[in-house]
Amino acid sequence: SGGGKTHLALELLKYLCGFVDRAAYDTLEQGLSLSFQNAWKNAAMQEVGSRVIVLAKEPIKELRERLRKRKSPNVIVIDSITALVGFTRTVFMELINEFPDKLFIFIAHEENNKPYPAIAQHVRKLSEVKIRVEGYKGFVTTRFKGEKGEGGADFVIWEQGANEYWIDKL
């Protein structure tokens, strides 16, 4: 909590809006709280206009109904798995199998350097790209080949926060 996950997800979503017509951010954990509104402003999400819809704590059942409609979002951020009640391996597999042409970005917390809750570990194992966030840095792991220019590089989410966090850890 407080390491930059939401900000990173918003920045990534803003970037992906350059390639898709519609995207959705399901803010299950924070809802439309002041902290989420501040993260939205800090990521300058107004730049994407109406291409991103914010879903305030929309459960998976309703999200699936939304995604079945014409002109539904192409990219969906779920923030976070921790706040998803009843999200099981079966529900996850049904979701990604029903919508194979959608890009899902799942956010999870960590306990002992592992995704939490347990379903988050399963989601991570099946993901093409994983970004572990710690101390305002994103550490990328991917199934793509970095030497072919397909992978991704680690990056700083917030320079001042990262500098303060990592100064004693290096």
Give, region by region, the residue ranges found by the protein language model:
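Alpha-helical scaffold elements adjacent to nucleotide-binding pockets in ATP/GTP-utilizing enzyme cores
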Residues: S35-A39, V91-E94, H122-L126
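Conserved catalytic network of the ASCE P-loop NTPase/AAA+ motor domain
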Residues: Y15-F19, E47, R68-K71, I96-P100, ...
